[in-house]
Amino acid sequence: MKNIFSIILISTTFTAAVFAQDCGQSFYAMKEKTKITTSNFDGKGKLTGTSEATVKSIQSTANGFVATMEVNAKNEKGKSVVEAKNFDVICENGTIKLDIGSMYLNEMAAQMKGMELTISGTGIDIPATLSEGQTLSDGDSDIKMGSNGMTFMTMKFSIKNRKVEKKEKITVAAGTYDAYKITYDMDMKVLFKKSIKAVQWLVPSIGMIKSETYNAKGELEGTTEMTKFEQ
């Protein structure tokens, strides 16, 4: 189960960069062999894990393209927790979408044989042009697990109150960038409900270079930042 949530964390990192109005102008690094390495830290700044995402291939379609991404993740000790999991980034008629369902299902299938799994949701979007004060749409995702037509467990994720606060220069381990700062609220419900507040910094043609999550008391719970960008 821990690996499932690792995948969810990684994939939501990439969903910060999707859905441009032009397939060639997305907040996403759409070039073959591009590799983005990120590091995760707890609220006290202690390393909790790293992940790598590589654009393996890009294929043109009648209305856009399909890019295949490969994700690898390691814990703080360098041990793999998610190894070589693929998902597709699909651009169709100017909208980019993530097809991460198969990645969830492949990981869950190995841990929960005999379980029936369904995934649904609206996703999130990022317009090709951002401006300070701009309000962005909400998004959600549900993962249901069951057997013989009965649901045993439902995981719900919803993102709301997304807003572009400002554009600012920010420095991470990978370098200094002009980034858009976006804030939002996220509700997660698995065995219990948890609400967090988050901040993300997005850079055109790269994606999210940093994020911070805070608990209901406003205390920093974790940070993710890009430590290497190879293209």
PLM features: residue spans?
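General secondary-structure propensity
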Residues: 18, 22, 119-120
